[in-house]
Design a protein with these regions (language model features):
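Conserved helicase C-terminal RecA-like lobe
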Residues: 163-300
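Conserved helix/coil segment N-terminal to the catalytic DExD/H
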Residues: 1-7
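Short, electropositive alpha-helical surface patch
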Residues: 93, 311-317
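Conserved helicase motor core of SF1/SF2 NTP-dependent helicases
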Residues: 12-15, 19-107, 121-139, 145-156, ...
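A short acidic-Thr-Gly-centered motif at the start of a beta-strand
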Residues: 5, 113-115, 234-238
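Conserved RecA-like ASCE P-loop NTPase motor core of nucleic-acid helicases/translocases
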Residues: 41, 73-75, 94-218, 229, ...
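Short, charged/polar "capping" segments at the starts of alpha-helices
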Residues: 305-310
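Flexible, charged surface loops at secondary-structure boundaries
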Residues: 7-10, 113-118, 291-292
């Protein structure tokens, strides 16, 4: 940072979520606190943004700054004690507040209308299952939105790139695009198609394409109607009275009385190509997702294929 001398300094500098700072942000913080003090709040086990440039060791590097004192914040005041017991399998040192409610943990293997209530938060490791479920909820008269305008933007860009008029042609284009991408990766890495489909590049693109594929159904007449439907699904103006669906990454900092985890088997999402820091952050993400629930944590234990083929029943039986 060649402009260090131009950075204003302060007697006290406060920084939140310090585990997700990148190198430049951390240097800026230290420059601003030069001659003063800084208070950094964070959690090593909530470092989940390495994929977008955060320094995975940011918390430790701040803690190792000369004259820095590290204090624990191990008591969780949000989650019920039963939820914390489950979370301790991931982060053993976390403790429940002594006066916290017990909380409930439930598991379901079917989708039903009665399973979803206004104000619920539904979390998933990937975007495509969320989009598919949101479509089912809307079709059954349940107000629901997917959190994340960037997901809608990426879907619309792919649809425009496909340049198709009919839903059927778009669906075929998606299948061909996935095959084309897998082949390109396989040739580049000199591996088979199965291994190519386990790479981050393929998984990320396939997730975006599957977001579109999951709502390419007969009820929609053309691509223009599909685009309008996508805008509706991601309209956060109705968030107060809706079932809110979100990726685990976007749920960071949020909470709800009742949280449903969609396809929990995707936590952690690890392949043989995952680096050590990526593996750690996948477990961190699982910890973040499980601890969004204040009272009730519900697991919808269905595979992505089962979710795609499932219809919403009237009850949980």
């Amino acid at each position: 940072m060649s402009y260090r001398t131009y950075i204003s300094t302060f007697k006290f500098v406060f920084i939140d979520e310090c585990q997700d700072l990148n190198a430049a942000q951390r240097e800026l913080m230290l420059c601003a606190a030069k001659g003063g003090r800084f208070v950094a709040v964070g959690d090593r086990k909530q470092a989940i943004n390495g994929f977008c440039g955060a320094d995975c060791l940011s918390f430790d590097k701040i803690a190792e700054t000369p004259n820095t004192i590290e204090l624990p914040l191990s008591v969780n005041y949000r989650c019920g004690s039963n939820i914390i017991k489950l979370v301790q399998e991931i982060v053993p040192q976390i403790k429940a507040y002594e006066n916290s409610e017990s909380g409930t943990i439930e598991t379901y293997k079917v989708l039903s209308k009665s399973l979803f209530h206004n104000g619920d938060m539904v979390l998933c490791r990937k975007s495509a299952p969320l989009v598919g479920l949101c479509f089912k909820l809307l079709q059954n008269g349940i107000t629901a939105i997917v959190k994340g305008g960037d997901i809608a933007e990426s879907m619309l860009k792919l649809i425009n790139r496909a340049n198709c008029n009919s839903i059927n042609d778009l669906s075929k284009w998606i299948d061909n695009e996935k095959k084309k991408t897998a082949t390109e990766i396989a040739e580049y890495l000199n591996v088979g198609l199965d291994k190519a489909k386990k790479t981050k590049r393929y998984i990320n693109l396939a997730d975006k394409l599957d977001c579109i594929k999951n709502i390419c159904v007969s009820q929609l007449t053309d691509v223009t109607e599909l685009k309008d439907y996508i805008q509706k699904m991601f309209d956060e103006k109705s968030i107060k009275n809706a079932v809110v669906l979100s990726t685990a990454h976007k749920s960071k900092g949020l909470e709800a009385d009742r949280v449903l985890i969609l396809t929990p088997s995707n936590f952690p999402m690890i392949t043989k190509y995952s680096k050590e820091w990526e593996v750690q952050q996948e477990y961190n993400l699982k910890y973040v997702a499980w601890t969004r629930a204040k009272k009730d944590l519900v697991f919808i234990d269905m595979s992505e294929n089962e979710l795609n083929n499932a219809e919403l029943t009237e009850d949980n039986k």
